[in-house]
Amino acid sequence: MRARRRPRYSEGMAEPPRSNRLGGMALANGLLVHGPGHWAAAVRDEDGRVVVASGRKHLFRAGPLTDLPFARGLVRLGEAFAVLPSVRRGLPQARFAMEDRRAVAGAVAATVVAAIARRRLRWVIAQEAVGAVAGLAPALLTLRGSRSAVWHAVEPKSSAAYESGGADEVANADVHAKEHERCGSNLILPLLVCTTIGNTISRTLFRRRALGARTVVSALSIGAAVEVFSFSARRPEHPLSRLVHGVGHAMQSGFATREPSQSDLLVGRAAMEALLRAEERDGTLTA
């Protein structure tokens, strides 16, 4: 009889209805969360006060395309990133992690490394693999030794609390794990592999001027990565899922997250409560 495999993430976390799943993003000074129809963010400003704002999401209406494999992932990613301008307008105190000077330095370094790889390495796939890994530099430099790692832990702890016990459980986010199976860290491996393969195919089959075709291949690569990410969340016991979550968990526990204080969790709680109030008004979250 095979021993039951120990779960990597919070054991008490039940699978929530899909419409109840919340997304989030660590800010440099707080937390952004979003649900089916709204976003909310809470930050601690320079005076130490918690400032909160919320608003409606811009939903992409693409008809049947919204539910097609590959395309649906791009739509969801687009919706998540589309809230950023709204957050900037609604909460001027918010600071995005990518604004960190280390992220800018990392982006420059990644560009240089990718350029060197294209000149020095013979195989296209090797060039693209090095470029893809180097592309992680901005995120790694932002998280390493910065407050962003704390906020990157507040988001999964708050989400796991809500998914396991509803709105009342958000106050107990401190007892939940800072690693989450739907954290963006679990998208890293699929994204590296899919974009490396996609860019290799694109450079091999299409001319440099075939911008349209190469753009389509790049979009499909990202869509494929999101499909792998979603599959892994649905079937965590599958060998592929274990590999994806193993890499993601190692990143989350190793350097991408750092245990937050109670003061930090209060900011996350403020963001979650603002989001839940907004969604409750529209009835977009089910019991």
Description of each model-found segment:
Residues M1-A287:
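Short amphipathic, positively biased membrane-proximal segments
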